[in-house]
């Protein structure tokens, strides 16, 4: 009896310690994140599941000199809280640092009056709205609708997190220079014709950073609008789809791909 009690206690302690380590890891070191839109194609695809290094940037200040932190660098693929809706996480590429002068002319980005060499940039035709989001939803009597700059909510549920993201004015030139404020950063999607980013809603505060995208640990072929559907039934359908098609729809060649 005493032996069984000891085993039970050891098991309980192991579970508690494991949970504490997991909580610490996801809070301070690494966290999972999935790609819901095509704004970073073709570097990151819808259905890519990432591990995000939350430790790399850390806190700026005196203590950072003694820890393996580093400052965000131009070209980093970062995950951050969307400034207009902080509970939503975005992933973009860091283009402008604090104090930089940013100009976008056509398809060329100028940083401090010099054109930026962007080998990772794509210009992919976004297609029609039906290709992205399926049939239109016509609100019925009694629905509560909130229309924001980059989202439409019906009864508290986001129908499309990035309506504007898929259809920015592709011919627009941003002739007015943008000066990145202190402790803020300018971020853009690699898929420039299909990205709602700092060109539209401004810079990202440093304290909104969640981390640097590190690796694709799993990639699953996913319909373009599936991750934007967040209802309970929608999530259940997603899980069933993964179980049924795990082997046939997993993008095996993207597994464990380092994000650059």
Predicted regions and their residues:
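Extended hydrophobic leader/signal-anchor segments used for secretion and membrane insertion
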Residues: 1-260
């Amino acid at each position: 009896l005493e032996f069984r009690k000891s085993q039970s206690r050891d098991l309980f302690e192991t579970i508690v310690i494991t949970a504490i380590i997991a909580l610490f890891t996801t809070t301070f070191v690494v966290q999972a994140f999935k790609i819901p839109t095509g704004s970073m194609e073709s570097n990151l695809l819808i259905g890519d599941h990432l591990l995000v290094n939350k430790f790399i940037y850390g806190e700026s200040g005196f203590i950072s000199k003694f820890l393996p932190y580093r400052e965000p660098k131009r070209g980093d693929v970062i995950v951050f809280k969307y400034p207009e809706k902080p509970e939503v996480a975005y992933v973009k590429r860091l283009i402008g640092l604090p104090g930089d002068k940013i100009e976008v002319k056509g398809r060329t980005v100028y940083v401090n009056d010099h054109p930026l060499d962007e080998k990772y940039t794509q210009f992919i035709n976004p297609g029609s709205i039906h290709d992205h989001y399926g049939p239109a939803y016509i609100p019925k009597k009694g629905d509560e609708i909130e229309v924001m700059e980059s989202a439409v909510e019906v009864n508290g549920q986001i129908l499309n997190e990035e309506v504007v993201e898929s259809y920015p004015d592709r011919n627009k030139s941003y002739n007015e220079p943008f000066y990145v404020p202190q402790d803020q950063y300018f971020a853009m999607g690699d898929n420039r014709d299909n990205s709602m980013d700092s060109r539209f809603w401004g810079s990202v505060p440093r304290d909104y950073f969640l981390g640097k995208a590190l690796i694709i640990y799993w990639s699953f072929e996913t319909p373009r609008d599936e991750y934007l559907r967040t209802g309970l039934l929608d999530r259940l359908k997603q899980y069933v789809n993964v179980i049924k098609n795990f082997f046939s729809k997993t993008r095996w060649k993207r597994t464990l791909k380092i994000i650059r």
